[in-house]
Amino acid sequence: MATEKLRAVLDTNVPVAAYLSRNPRSPTKELIDRWRNEEFVQLYSDGTLAELKQKFAEKGIEPLLVDRYIADLLRIGVHVEFDPGDIEPVIPADPDDDLIVACAVAGGATHIVTYDPHFEVLGGEYKGIEVVDGLAFLRLVRGAVS
């Protein structure tokens, strides 16, 4: 019996952490590798993609790595469209984070994956979407494919 793959919106801090980590066994690096192996579905929107490109540039991530990640996201990620008017203000400390939540809701995500403490205001869940950090999500992905 096949089970549905986990569907996640990765906050920009997750892939940025993977690329900045010097640890070859970094959980975020493993998470990105498992996504590339299509062990879970990554959802993105035009807005989250633009923010991702901006954060990669701000953090000085090597352009070739950025290009590969973006190309992979466009190839195997699932693009989510929604009306900007549908973005609910749920993260008062950082309204930009509402874009991540809106993408997750519109895309039928099972999870939002983030290291951002602003998401703590959601209490670990929003409209049935679990909000977890990268390590917790990696454990779920490992369990889903074993």
Predicted regions and their residues:
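Active-site neighborhoods of divalent-metal-dependent phosphate/nucleic-acid chemistry enzymes
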Residues: 78-111, 117
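PIN-domain endoribonuclease scaffold, especially VapC-family toxins
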Residues: 33-87
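Short secondary-structure boundary segments
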Residues: 12, 46, 115-117
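Acidic, PIN/NYN-like endoribonuclease modules and their adjacent C-terminal/linker elements
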Residues: 110, 117-146
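Residues that scaffold the ATP/ADP-binding catalytic core of kinase and kinase-like folds
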Residues: 17-19, 55, 122, 140-141
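Hydrophobic/aromatic ligand-binding patch that stacks against planar heteroaromatic rings
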Residues: 34, 103, 123
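Short, well-structured N-terminal submotif of metal-dependent ribonuclease cores
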Residues: 1-44
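Short, active-site-adjacent cap segments at secondary-structure transitions
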Residues: 15-16, 49-50, 119-121
